Amino acid sequence: MAVSPQVRAGAPAVPERPRARKARTGGRAGYGFVSGYFVLLLLFGIGPTVYAIWLAISNSSGQLVGFGNFTQVLGDYRFFPAFANVALYLVIWLVVLVVAVVGIALMLHGRMRRASAVSRFFFYLPGALAGAASALVWMFMLDPSVSPVAWLLHGLGYGTFSDTIAPSRLPVVFAIMAFWTGAGGWIVVMYGALNNIPGELLEAARIDGASVLKTAWYVQIPLLRKWIAYMLILAFATGTQLFVEPQLVGEASLGQVSDTWSPNQLAYEYAFHANNFNDASAVSIYLLVLGLAAAALVVFKSGLFEVGS
């Protein structure tokens, strides 16, 4: 009977198996891809944030002043109106976004399955006109003298561009602009999330006699909870950074709209008109804290990072 030989001391090592070597190489490649994200995050996220914090707690000479800059901007008569304007805009924008995006996604999923591919493509198109381009298009649309929907504007009692962009109407106007450019992508995301809901759940609801509305309210929407929370966090962060739209509309209004309508405009005013980057950084830190607080609230209330729910 043959006996397997014993491994002698000093014997040559057994060559590493190709599969193990390939797995190790694949792991290193994964770290390489992820490292690019962290480098960009450090350069354009964490680094600027740390620098802004330093500017916010120091003066132009580099001396620490603690919360002096925060107190100074808080006492500016333009501070609270700017934040109030954006707060009203966010309420309108987020409510319309959630209701319309979820509603349209449910409609696509339930009633327009055959046409959904074409519809999703068209939902993406408005996003091609973002920022300044979108604002310019909407300024053209909102001017009754040249707008293709002038009949609608006249019917609403808006005879001139100044009537359309009256300060009291700006939160609604900016919410419409934001929905036009940003909702399409979220509709497609929600539609994809609906497709991941097991068909057995929907079939069980139908067997139990649930109507389409009850199925949506008690089955589909609860399963979209985390996606809705994720959308709210990103939309809130984007909304607090509102700048391009009020800036362009303000320039076109010939002084009718304030140059500091939004907090970002106020920070811009501090930095580039008053040459006060310290107060501008303080405003940006206020926005950062507000965004982080809102994100934390949504995460904890929705269980966004809970596993298995």
What residue ranges belong to the model's regions?
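Short, Lys/Arg-rich, polar N-terminal cytosolic tail immediately upstream
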Residues: 1-25
